[in-house]
A protein has these predicted regions:
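First transmembrane helix
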Residues: 107-134, 241-258
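Interfacial "cap-and-anchor" motif at the non-cytosolic start of specific transmembrane alpha-helices
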Residues: 153-328
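Primarily the dimerization/phosphotransfer
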Residues: 329, 336-374
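Extended carbohydrate-recognition surfaces in non-catalytic/accessory domains of CAZymes
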Residues: 1-26
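Aromatic-lined ligand-binding clefts that engage carbohydrates, nucleic acids, or primary amines
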Residues: 22, 26-44, 78-82
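Juxtamembrane interface at the cytosolic side of transmembrane helices
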Residues: 127-149
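Beta-strand-rich ligand-recognition modules
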Residues: 44-77, 82-94
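Short, aromatic-rich amphipathic segments at membrane interfaces
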Residues: 94-113
Length: 374
């Protein structure tokens, strides 16, 4: 809505109107309506069929969710009345999908299964990794991997939240954006640990500070800056774009440099490079790519990153087990060697004491005889 306001405020109210002529279909017609930012009323042929939130400026209430409703055959007039006074998106951002009932249900089910698999698979990996770290007091790699998986699962869970219809205001978007920066913070820390010599230290520190700053910047923007300074929304978008370009190049270049220097960490570096590449592609294709069945570029690359880290964790765990087996075997050999050495020392001492006792017999006998004479 910013083009309608002199101060370029993205907040306001808008009306979308679409006229359709749908042929008779035994299967019926369904319309999938994605998130409408941030409150809306949906009318079909003048009849109100859905209402989410409150559009009034005075009593404004946000309610963002996905919706699915049927349309009649023949002439259809679709009206979507929207209002937004809180989010960096306004109105209809993602296109609705119209089709037969079976096609739309198949589409929605495939998408939900896809996101549920990504979410719960990574949560399972996180639980296993953190439990290993907690029970065995293992290395920091396990807890870092666990936090990474939890953050990715939170970041990927937004379709499930929107379809459940739970009204949590802007909190799901704060969680989605915040978890993204937690992932990048973990990646930055791991990159610094692996290739601190690839760049000057100031670059690593700048990347880490940028991630932490953006992590704090997200809730500050949603809860303070956007409501009281609407024009800041455009600045927020520019900051996000600069951040994505910088971090993607940082991860990719660092991975390429260190891969030639240390082949042992190739799995971790590959994960960094894949995720950095996904961030860059997502930025370059913004507004040009809309997933129909499955996910976005960063979501694919993020899952590949999790899989690469899974391989890294498995290799690390295998190496730890082999080291323990090696130490156990050599500990047994060491115990046997020490036992033989102690046995030999005891025998030598017995022989020494026997010789001393034998040498002392004659002087003792002479002393006893002398005492008897006295």
């Amino acid at each position: 809505f910013s083009s309608f306001h002199k101060d370029k405020s993205p907040f306001g109210r808008g009306l979308y109107r679409k006229q359709l002529h749908l042929e008779a279909n035994a299967d019926g017609w369904l319309l999938e309506l994605p998130e409408i930012f941030s409150a809306c009323k949906v009318y079909v042929n003048g009849e109100l069929i859905h209402s989410y939130g409150n559009l009034s400026r005075k009593d404004y209430e946000i309610h963002i969710r996905n919706a699915l409703f049927s349309l009649p055959s023949g002439y259809v007039e679709l009206l979507i009345d929207t209002a937004n006074y809180s989010h960096y998106y306004s109105g209809m951002i993602y296109p609705p999908v119209l089709g037969t009932s079976s096609d739309i249900l198949h589409l929605v089910n495939c998408r939900l299964i896809f996101y549920a698999f990504l979410c719960f698979f990574t949560l399972g990996c996180a639980v296993i990794s953190i439990s290993i770290w907690f029970r065995r007091k293992a290395g920091a790699l396990y807890i870092a991997y666990g936090i990474l998986c939890i953050s990715y699962a939170v970041h990927i869970s937004y379709p499930l939240i929107h379809w459940l219809g739970i009204n949590m205001g802007v909190l799901p978007y704060v969680m989605e954006d915040g978890s993204f920066f937690v992932i990048l913070t973990c990646m930055t820390v791991l990159t610094y640990r692996l290739c601190s010599h690839a760049f000057p230290r100031i670059i690593h520190l700048a990347a880490y500070a940028f991630c932490i700053g953006m992590l704090l910047f997200v809730p500050l923007s949603h809860y303070v800056l956007f409501p009281f300074l609407p024009s800041f929304v455009s600045i927020y978008g520019d900051v996000m774009a600069i951040f994505k370009i910088f971090l993607s190049l940082y991860l990719i270049v660092a991975a390429c440099i260190i891969s030639y220097q240390n082949q042992d960490d190739i799995w971790m570096l590959s994960a960094n490079a894949v995720f950095g590449f996904g961030i860059l592609i997502d930025y370059l294709t913004a507004g040009r790519y809309e997933p129909l069945h499955f996910g976005w570029q960063t979501e694919y690359c993020g899952f590949i990153m999790v899989l690469l880290f899974t391989v890294l964790i498995l290799r690390y765990s295998r190496r730890i087990l082999l080291e323990r087996e090696y130490l156990t075997e050599h500990l047994k050999e060491e115990v046997e060697r020490k036992t033989a050495w102690l046995t030999r020392m005891m025998d030598e001492r017995k022989e020494f004491l026997s010789a001393v006792a034998h040498d002392l017999k004659a002087p003792v006998a002479a002393i006893n005889t002398y005492i008897d004479y006295i």
